[in-house]
Regions:
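PEST-like low-complexity, intrinsically disordered acidic/proline/serine-rich tracts
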Residues: 2-3, 9-10, 15-249
Length: 249
C-alpha cells in the first residue's frame, strides 16, 4: 500500500460523520427563517463565565495535520529521527490503525466533540472511539504524578473570559498528526480557550515537551459550533477493515 493510500485509509477509518438529528438544538439564536445565527453573542452561565457547551468541529478537520501547517518544529534529535522513521515506514504504527485513542491535542483538532460545562467540571465527549476528557475547574492544582493516559489530566482556571487549561499525565503514545509528529510522556499542554461568539471558538495551544522539542511552540485551533445534530455511537472495532493492510515497507 502506498503512503498516500494508507493515509486515506486511516482517515476514512478515524473520522466519523455526525448524524442528522430529527430535532433542532434548543437555545441557539436563529434568524427569522429559522437558520442558526452563529454570529450572535457568546452565551454565559449564571455566574457570568462564558459557556463553552455545545457540539464543535473544525471545518477542515478531514485534512491531514492542518493545525500543524507551516510550523518549524524545534526538534530534539531523537524526536526528529522517530518522525522520519514513521514516515519511512508508511505510518504503519499509527495508534488509530489499531483503534486506539487519538490523544491530545489531536482529538480536539480532528474529532467532532460535545462540551458539557458545569461550575466545577467540563466534560468533553468525542465521537471517535466514544472517548472522553475531564477538565477540572474547581481550583485543584495540576498533579505531579497523574496516572499516565491518552487524554492526560487537565485543570483549568479563568483569566477574564479566557479559560486556561493545563494538562499533563500523558502516556506519550499519541501522535500529533497522521504523519507521525511525536509527543512524549513529558508533554505539558496549555490551552487558552475563548468563545468568540455563539458559533466560533479560538484556542491557542502551547506544546511544552522537553523530551521531544528543544523549546515550547504554539499553534491554534478554531472550532465551529455544529447545530441541529448530535453525537452518534462510533465503535472503531466494529468498522475496522484496514489494520491488516498497515504493514509498512
Amino acid at each position: 500500500m502506498t503512503q498516500i493510500g494508507m493515509m486515506l485509509a486511516i482517515m476514512a477509518l478515524g473520522v466519523p460523520m455526525s448524524a442528522q438529528w430529527p430535532a433542532k438544538t434548543p437555545g441557539i439564536p436563529r434568524t427569522a427563517d429559522g437558520k442558526p445565527r452563529l454570529s450572535a453573542p457568546a452565551p454565559r452561565r449564571p455566574d457570568g463565565k462564558p459557556d463553552f457547551s455545545g457540539l464543535w468541529e473544525h471545518l477542515n478537520a478531514r485534512t491531514s495535520a492542518y493545525y500543524l501547517k507551516d510550523i518549524a518544529f524545534p526538534w530534539q534529535p531523537s524526536a526528529k529521527a522517530l518522525f522520519e522513521e514513521r514516515k519511512a515506514n508508511n505510518q504503519k504504527d499509527n495508534p488509530e490503525g489499531q483503534c486506539l485513542p487519538r490523544g491530545l491535542p489531536k482529538a480536539d483538532a480532528f474529532d467532532i466533540h460535545k462540551i458539557v460545562q458545569t461550575p466545577e467540571l467540563i466534560v468533553v465527549l468525542y465521537e471517535y472511539g466514544t472517548t472522553f476528557r475531564q477538565i477540572f475547574i474547581d481550583g485543584r492544582a495540576l498533579p505531579t504524578d497523574a496516572n499516565p493516559s491518552w487524554m492526560g489530566y487537565s485543570v483549568g482556571h479563568w483569566e477574564g473570559d479566557t479559560l486556561v487549561v493545563e494538562s499533563n499525565g500523558f502516556n506519550g503514545k499519541a501522535w500529533l498528526s497522521f504523519e507521525g509528529v511525536p509527543i512524549s510522556d513529558a508533554l505539558h499542554l496549555t490551552e487558552r480557550m475563548r468563545r468568540r461568539d455563539f458559533g466560533h471558538m479560538d484556542i491557542e495551544l502551547t506544546i511544552d515537551d522537553p523530551k521531544a522539542y528543544t523549546k515550547p511552540w504554539t499553534t491554534e485551533l478554531h472550532p465551529e459550533l455544529v447545530p441541529d445534530t448530535e453525537l452518534i455511537e462510533f465503535v472503531c472495532n466494529e468498522n475496522e477493515r484496514d489494520a491488516r493492510h498497515l504493514v509498512g515497507k
